[in-house]
Structures are given as C-alpha cells and as structure tokens.
Amino acid sequence: MPRKIRQLIAELEKVGFVNRGGKGSHRNFLHPQCPYVVRISGNPGADALPYQEKDVKQALKEVSQ
C-alpha cells in the first residue's frame, strides 16, 4: 500500500526541508544541503506515486551524506 502525500511531506520537513510554495497542489521543498528542488504534487490525503516516493528517498539520502 503506497504512503500518503502527507507522510512524504512530514519526512521532508523532519530533516529540514522548507516548503517554498507552488501552484495549486504542487509544493516545492528546498534544503541547503540538497542541490535540487523536491516537488511534491497532490492533495495530502492522496496516495503517493512511485516516482514521488523515489524522489523523496533520493533527497533524504542526499541530505544524510
């Protein structure tokens, strides 16, 4: 069962990512140690898509290095 969008957002915010806004249901998360923007789209209660989970996993790995 896929995780929810709100869970991905919580994981990003827990390690220091900051939501820098976006349009509609899109959110842009930035972190000083991550060289790219992590974009999450969808309503918080929606299921996360596989590419979104992959992007978050990669960003968390990048920050932990």
Task: Please place each PLM-identified region on the residue numbering.
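Basic nucleic-acid-binding interfaces
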Residues: 2-21, 30-65
